[in-house]
């Protein structure tokens, strides 16, 4: 009744530490990670979203 690799339809994924190599094959990062890829970048700015940057003052770096 369930998948022998991932135990679907069980709620949690099937994983065993006695097979380290198998874990490595299917851990996070072996796929696209559509969502997780961008998390570190968003974490750096405290997950701020949809705000506009404050306007810089006129003669900041150009006056050298």
From Swiss-Prot:
- Gene Ontology MF, one: zinc ion binding
Q: Where are the zinc fingers (C4-type)?
A: 1-6
Task: Please provide one cellular component term from the Gene Ontology annotations of this protein.
Answer: cytosolic large ribosomal subunit
Q: Does the keyword RNA-binding apply?
A: yes
A Pfam family it matches: Ribosomal_L37e
The lineage's top-level taxon is Eukaryota
Keywords assigned by UniProt, alphabetized: Metal-binding, Ribonucleoprotein, Ribosomal protein, RNA-binding, rRNA-binding, Zinc, Zinc-finger
Kindly list the positions annotated as binding Zn(2+): 3, 6
GO biological process: one example: translation
Species in which this protein is naturally found? Solanum lycopersicum (Tomato)
Q: How is the cofactor bound?
A: Binds 1 zinc ion per subunit.
Q: What is this protein called?
A: Large ribosomal subunit protein eL37
Cofactor dependence = Zn(2+)
Q: What does this protein do?
A: Binds to the 23S rRNA.
